Regions:
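Pre-active-site segment of Zn-dependent metallo-hydrolases
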Residues: 10, 31-74, 86-90, 167-180
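Beta-strand-turn-beta hairpins that frame and shape the catalytic cleft
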Residues: 11-16, 29-36, 127-136, 155-161, ...
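Active-site metal-binding loops of divalent metal-dependent hydrolases
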Residues: 39-43, 78, 140-141, 165-167, ...
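Metallo-beta-lactamase
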Residues: 70-81, 214
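Short internal beta-strands
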Residues: 97-104, 213-218
Length: 256
C-alpha cells in the first residue's frame, strides 16, 4: 500500500484533514472519519486520450484507486484529469460510495455501466447533503470545453472550502462565491491554459474573496498545462500581502 494511502486511512478522528493528491485532486476527511474525494486523477489515461506526450504524467502516482474506499466523490466536469475514466470504476466499486458529477459526465458513467442509484448529477445552484459534508455547487466558466462544469463550496465541521473548479476569472460572481459566508479555504487553478485562471487571476480572486487560506492547484503534472507556483507567490506578495497562501506538494496534508 502506498504511504499516502496509509496517511489518509490513519489520519486521526477529531480533526478535519485536507490532502493534496496532485493536479486538481484533493481529499477531505471529516472529524468523524468520513472521506470526500474531489477530481482525483490517479491513472495515466491522459496521454492515451490526447494522443501526445504533452499529457504524459510527469509526477508519479501516489495513490491507487483500489487503496481507499471513499464515502463520497465529486467530479466537477468530464475532462480526464477530473473524471478519470480508468480509475472511476475502481473508485465506485464499493456499494457504499456515492458520486456527485456534473451532468456532462453521464456519457462516461454509461460507458462504464456504473450504478446510477449511487450517482447524483449536479448543476450550479444544487445543494446536496452528503453525510458530514454539505455541498453547494456553483457556476464554473470553463467555456465551450465543458459548458456544464461546476465548482463547489464544501461545508464540513464548521469549515467552508471553496473549490473554484476549472474556470476563468469571474469577479462578477463574487456574491455567489460568498453566498454561504466567508471562506476558510479557496482552492483554484493557476495554469492559465484551456480557459483557466492563471497566476495573476488566482491572486486577484484571493484578493477579492479574502479567504483565510488560498491553495493554488492545476500545475506541474503535464508539460502542456502550464502554471508557475513561483510566479504566483510573487504576485500574491505584491497584490495581497496580507492573504495567507500555501503551495501543497503531492501527498501533503493540513489540518483545517
Amino acid at each position: 500500500m502506498n504511504p499516502f494511502a496509509i496517511s489518509v486511512l490513519t489520519a486521526p478522528k477529531g480533526m478535519t484533514h485536507l490532502f493534496y493528491v496532485g493536479q486538481a485532486g484533493f481529499i477531505v476527511k471529516s472529524k468523524s472519519g468520513q472521506t470526500l474525494a474531489l477530481d482525483l486523477y490517479l491513472s495515466d489515461c491522459g496521454e492515451r486520450f490526447e494522443g501526445h506526450i504533452g499529457f504524459k504524467r510527469l509526477l508519479p502516482r501516489i495513490l491507487s484507486p483500489q487503496e481507499v474506499i471513499f464515502d463520497y466523490i465529486i467530479a466537477t466536469h468530464p475532462h480526464f484529469d477530473h473524471y478519470d475514466v480508468d480509475s472511476m470504476p475502481f473508485l465506485m466499486s464499493n456499494p457504499h460510495t456515492r458520486l456527485y458529477a456534473s451532468v456532462d459526465c453521464k456519457q462516461f458513467v454509461d460507458q462504464a455501466a456504473l450504478d446510477e442509484k449511487r450517482i447524483t448529477y449536479v448543476k450550479p445552484g444544487n445543494t446536496c447533503h452528503a453525510g458530514d459534508f454539505l455541498l453547494h455547487f456553483i457556476n464554473c466558466d470553463h467555456g465551450t470545453l465543458a459548458p456544464d462544469a461546476v465548482g463547489v463550496i464544501i461545508e464540513v465541521d464548521g469549515k467552508r472550502i471553496m473549490v473554484a473548479g476549472d474556470t476563468c476569472l469571474r469577479l462578477d460572481r463574487k456574491d455567489e462565491y460568498l453566498s454561504k459566508g466567508s471562506l476558510d479555504v479557496m482552492i483554484a487553478p493557476i495554469n492559465g491554459a484551456y480557459g483557466n485562471l492563471n497566476e495573476d487571476d488566482c491572486a486577484e480572486l484571493s484578493k477579492v474573496l479574502s479567504p483565510e487560506l488560498t491553495i493554488p492547484c492545476h500545475y506541474g503534472l503535464f508539460a502542456t498545462h502550464g502554471g508557475l507556483p513561483g510566479l504566483f507567490m510573487e504576485i500574491m506578495r505584491e497584490k495581497c500581502p496580507d492573504n495567507d497562501y500555501l503551495l501543497m506538494t503531492m501527498g501533503e496534508s493540513i489540518i483545517l
